[in-house]
Regions:
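Short, flexible, mixed-charge glycine/proline-rich loop motifs
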Residues: 1-8, 16, 38-45
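Short cysteine-rich clusters marking metal-coordination/redox-active sites
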Residues: 11-14, 50-53
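Short, non-ligating residues that shape and space the ligands of small metal-coordination modules
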Residues: 17-24, 44-45, 56-60
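Short cysteine/histidine-rich zinc-coordinating motifs and their immediately flanking basic loops
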Residues: 22-30, 61-73
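Short linker/helix segments within small regulatory modules
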Residues: 25-47
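Histone-fold modules and their flanking histone-like tails across chromatin and transcription assemblies
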Residues: 66-126
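Short, well-ordered alpha-helical segments
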Residues: 102-109, 115-164
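C-terminal edge-of-domain segments
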Residues: 171-211, 222-223
């Protein structure tokens, strides 16, 4: 025989009386989608909150969420290059486990190949610099994708990296840059040097925390909403 859970009469956090109707307003339990972010950033561990206390807790927690997320993004961006990405298939003295293939793709804006139609002088002047800049940006984006995917797999290096270029979009002159590689986990990390080891440890923690924050539902609501009846 199933047991019926007792109906709450007071808020588990602030002990305010719960009211579903009446002449002086209501005070209902808020939707459970707000609970994870409140608990994560307030230090509280209640399963439910009421309208009276949840709004301020939610606003404060949401602010802390975005501050930490932005700080993590800056940290990851500043040290992501510490993940080695090399074309060698079996680097000398590396002892590692193969994890999985990782890939990265980037498509530039329009007008890339139109630069080839310019004069010979222009091609070897300013326009060649703009063209190379677009390619370089695409390569850097692909490298970042490979490195992030490697860390997310629990690895610390990418070997056997390969890069390809292709024209896409017909006459729109768009360039796709594609990279592939194999994510590995190096066991004898001393081959990378102490500074890189420390950066990899910091990067791994930042990526793990960033992934966890992504699992928390942060709504666009400015105000908390109640549970549906």
């Amino acid at each position: 025989m199933e047991q019926t859970l007792p109906t709450l009469t007071d808020c588990p956090h602030c002990n305010s009386k719960l009211k579903t109707g009446g002449l002086i307003g209501t005070n209902k339990l808020v939707s459970k989608k707000f609970i994870p972010i409140i608990n994560e950033f307030s230090g509280l561990h209640h399963e439910q909150y009421c309208e009276k206390c949840a709004q301020k807790l939610y606003e404060t927690s949401k602010g802390k969420f975005f501050i930490e997320r932005n700080a993590l993004d800056k940290t990851i961006e500043s040290i992501i290059d510490c993940v080695p990405v090399i074309s060698l298939q079996s680097p000398h003295k590396w002892e590692y486990d193969v994890l999985d293939m990782v890939t990265g793709q980037s498509t530039t804006g329009t007008g890339v190949f139109s630069e080839f139609k310019s004069s010979f002088t222009d091609f070897f002047g300013m326009q060649s610099g703009a063209y190379n800049s677009k390619i370089s940006n695409g390569e850097n984006l692909c490298l970042t994708q490979l490195r992030l995917k490697c860390i997310q797999l629990g690895g610390n290096a990418v070997i056997g990296a390969d890069i390809d270029y292709a024209e896409v979009g017909g006459d729109k002159g768009m360039l796709m840059v594609c990279m592939t590689g194999t994510a590995v986990k190096i066991h004898n990390t001393e081959v990378l040097g102490q500074e890189r080891i420390q950066s990899l440890e910091k990067l791994t923690k930042a990526v793990e925390r960033r992934q966890y924050l992504r699992s928390i539902d942060v709504t666009n609501n400015a105000y908390v909403t109640v549970e549906a009846s």
